[in-house]
């Protein structure tokens, strides 16, 4: 029987947490479909990636510059990627996300990008 497993934001908030999730997935061959959330809070006072993406969406909607906000999100993912020792760059994906926010992509788009990006990281980590 094949299983679908969903991991929440706090369980994918850092490279250390990613490794634990990887161990869980690898421990049961029937866990074939993985649904990752966007990275959540790493510690009290931290900001969830989804909230950071919503902030970009709202700023872009007002015509404000969002490059700095995008870079903060990208740095968060890069920290995870580096901690997992992956040879992975998300530059193209972040450029596309920034372009789409500026073109007034909706709030649903903002909500989905964290999961989208974490899916890429997870797929590369699991091989």
Language-model-derived ranges and their functions:
Residues 1-127:
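Nucleotide/pyrophosphate-binding catalytic subdomain
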